[in-house]
Amino acid sequence: MADSSWRLMQYDSIAINVIVENKKGGINFCDIPYSDDIQKFNEDYLRLTSEAAAECESSSLENMMVVGTSAMIGTELDSIVNQYTDKFCNPMLMWGSYRCGLFRTALPISFQFHHVQMDGSHAARFLELLRVT
């Protein structure tokens, strides 16, 4: 028998979730509404992350599809493993330190998709389009 609490949701807007180190040395998360206007996005990012750091409180945007991100700049990584729950079924993007070579610099990233958003073939197509652009 199917669980009737599950439903497919469509959102009109998205947000980017970031982790913020707060003034007490702990962490909080902060959802930043996405905007095509990079200046507006930057203003929102600076304001909301500053508030989260100063107030030591997390903020979330329940009415938006939230894409999780995490910077793990203290380490090099090739992939991330994330445990999905019924509460957090959003896509995730993580990155580590830059890798500097003789002729190029690379930033390894790890995308994770939940089957709620896309199947494996769709994720592979998205990543291939990202790679060639």
Label each residue range with its predicted role.
Residues 81-87:
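Short, Gly/Ser/Thr-enriched beta-strand-loop segments that form substrate-interacting elements
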